[in-house]
Amino acid sequence: MAKEIKFSEDARAAMLRGVDQLANTVKTTLGPKGRNVVLDKSYGSPEITNDGVTIAKSIDLEDHYENMGAKLVAEVASKTNDIAGDGTTTATVLAQSIIREGMKNVTAGANPVGIRTGIEKATKAAVDELHKISHKVNGKKEIAQVASVSSSNTEVGSLIADAMEKVGHDGVITIEESKGIDTELSVVEGMQFDRGYLSQYMVTDNDKMEADLDDPYILITDKKISNIQDILPLLQEIVQQGKALLIIADDVAGEALPTLVLNKIRGTFNVVAVKAPGFGDRRKAQLEDIATLTGGTVISSDLGLDLKDTKLEQLGRAGKVTVTKDNTTIVDGAGSKDAIAERVNIIKKQIDDTTSDFDREKLQERLAKLAGGVAVVKVGAATETELKERKYRIEDALNATRAAVEEGYVAGGGTALVDVLPAVAALKEEGDVQTGINIVLRALEEPVRQIAENAGKEGSVIVEQLKKEKQGVGYNAATDEWEDMAKSGIIDPTKVTRSALQNAASVAALMLTTEAVVADKPDPNANNNAAAGANPAAGMGGMM
């Protein structure tokens, strides 16, 4: 297809229009008084959300050049979500400010490379200062506060704190949809290991790119499966029962993998294959753990067992299995409590006996997975639309809480970004590099400005007042009061704030140094073809 190219000012102006359209949509959701956005769906009812990354990903603009600008900012939100799990709206607001102010200066004749250098230096200074003013999370109360701010709901905050208390900071917490209207927390025996599906065609949820198996059989083996004939009799029995199957093996390759994928796509049966976790002797031990949890048997040559002779009774069972590209979570395994308790005692004895710190750490990981269980948050709501919106909020809250446990927390509501202004302002450079620093100084004020404007206040007035307050004191948009943010429970994970700034600065700096944009040339016949398709009688020359 022929290409169309725009250069310098034309290219940047078109991309900026796209940036503004996306960012102006997303930033209306920022803060406790942020609004919702309604997303049209090709099927089902419209979706109502205030989740920044969900909104950003759903926006496609008709103009190719504008769409490129929008997609680059959507990438900022997506990357921040991947790293920290929250802060996507803040990242979008920061990116828009840096891009907009940067393009003004580039248009006025500034050197974009110098501006980029200034942006990078200012961002590093801001991130270093964020780490200095960060506080460690101590106890259930602070965990609940982080989750409450992220979800704008104190009940959700308490729920996440309870879940973390029950399974530990590193424990597995999953979020499911409930059939009722109440949101509940339960802890079930379960395990998670760091192996994902071998083919993305095995997923059952294309939005989340994960596979959910209800009440599946689980084949556990340390062998490599390359010939489908080895497990064909077993597969036929499972298909007859209408059950799903999880295969945990050394590898699934050769003709076996495409055959399984083909049967999954055709709807013959639901199957997911993953590689066994660990390596060497540690892999064998982990497979035994999984077998104990699910009430199955490891099909291994060491035990004189062959795949061809495997019976249904030797397979494990579980209430639910969720597989993503990176992890497999087994919930409600069918193993007996006595067998699990015995296995736990064996691992505890091994921990006491070992002299290796590395081995002790790995054994403790196995113990946590086997004995800790999985916390399941069942999200309830009156309608499907409300259910989806509430689920997004709880997922954000969980991600924010984990980020806070990892790197600590700072004052929320955009206060921390204003608190680091003096450290950034202390940088003194020449010319366009200083211009880049000034651009970041302005951008750091933008989240507070937007939160205030969403609450019906004059953003500039709030920002100027905030600069006069002592560190940690900020504007609480929910109560319209000036408060010590940490004492009021308005705190953000340091990792979320840091990631939002770093990702925004990175993409903004790249956009400012863009000199040409290449896009597909619009097809002049496309509209004519569409019109003809919409009117079957078109071109039939009066044959009536």
UniProtKB/Swiss-Prot annotation:
Residues 524-538 have a biased composition (Low complexity). The keyword Nucleotide-binding applies. Residues 522-544 are annotated as: Disordered. ATP binds at residues 29-32, 86-90, 413, 476-478, 492. It catalyses: ATP + H2O + a folded polypeptide = ADP + phosphate + an unfolded polypeptide. Belongs to the chaperonin (HSP60) family. Together with its co-chaperonin GroES, plays an essential role in assisting protein folding. The GroEL-GroES system forms a nano-cage that allows encapsulation of the non-native substrate proteins and provides a physical environment optimized to promote and accelerate protein folding. Forms a cylinder of 14 subunits composed of two heptameric rings stacked back-to-back. Interacts with the co-chaperonin GroES. PANTHER family: 60 KDA HEAT SHOCK PROTEIN, MITOCHONDRIAL. This is Chaperonin GroEL. The gene is groEL.
